[in-house]
């Protein structure tokens, strides 16, 4: 008997433990969200080629991903996106219809696409439970996306729904010059400051030029100053000052060297993406929840204020007599009657005019004259009868 009880107790504990594990697994499945990656970079930095390499890496490792192309002006893509802006907006037709140049055509195409981006978001959300990554390929003209209203709308919509990371692609061979390097870093800083999202700086084309010099400049202020020793111009002095200002900014960045050609650094790239996603949950999501709470509290406070005002009005009017202004009501009724009279007269006038135009009015008058004559004849007969009666009375 005791053995049976012990076995039952053990079985119960095991079952409870399994239920807890199953619940935890279910919670993890419900909480799982794909990481949204927005790829940015100057024209010629290799964004699209890098995205092709990322797509190949995901396919090779059987990692589910979802790619959205937001460049309406690209003629040919080296990969097949899941959603393509070109299927919705005809870039050349937009330029022709609105008489726009290349950049204006891209901005207008993005604006048109962003008006329906909530539908895109619905499609992505339906598949999100089976995805690990969502990747957005942006136009080559970086300012068209980062500084436009449509780019901001798309970024904020995605960031409010999924953990979002910005990837700023840098052309490494062109960054060996300290001034060019500083220009890239300033642009990355401005994007990060505007969006408040975590960022990964991807130094592309490391198969041509190694990126270690750039990481050293970011981590060691003195090494960057040494690189500027032979530049006595005002630009060199400005770059020195800016490097001191950006030193703290570098500490918030994740950086990695990659090659879109041979695939070097792709594994490390995804590691950095994971670290940046943690920063999203730690900072951006907390700020987002704070903003939502502030908005909700403000709306609740406004509702409470209106409710209190309504209660005060009800209390003040409680037991009060309602006075009816009969004079005002009578005046209103008289105005309505006067209006109706004028309306009737106007209708009669219109009817008379219509009858006169159609010839009916004349015949109507003739009928009236004949009616008057018959009445006069009857009157004369009555008069003669009365006179005859009076004569008879006098004779009597």
Swiss-Prot record:
Alphabetical keyword list: Coiled coil, Cytoplasm, GTP-binding, Hydrolase, Nucleotide-binding, Nucleus
Which stretches are tagged as biased composition: Acidic residues? Answer: 343-380
Task: Supply one GO CC term from the record.
Answer: nucleus
Pfam families xrefs: ATP_bind_1 (PF03029)
Q: Which residues form a coiled coil?
A: 284-387
Principal localization?
Answer: cytoplasm
Which residues are listed for GTP binding in this entry?
Answer: 44-49, 204-207
The reply on keyword Hydrolase is yes
Which InterPro entries does this UniProt record tie to the protein? AAA+_ATPase, Gpn, Gpn1/Npa3/XAB1, P-loop_NTPase
The organism sits in which domain of life? Eukaryota
Q: Where is this motif: Gly-Pro-Asn (GPN)-loop?
A: 101-103
What EC number(s) has UniProt assigned to this enzyme?
Answer: 3.6.5.-
Assembly and partners are described as: Heterodimer with gpn3. Binds to RNA polymerase II (RNAPII).
What biological function has been recorded for the protein in this entry? Small GTPase required for proper nuclear import of RNA polymerase II (RNAPII). May act at an RNAP assembly step prior to nuclear import.
- List the protein's name: GPN-loop GTPase 1
Q: List the taxonomic lineage.
A: Eukaryota, Amoebozoa, Evosea, Eumycetozoa, Dictyostelia
Q: Could you tell me the gene encoding this protein?
A: gpn1
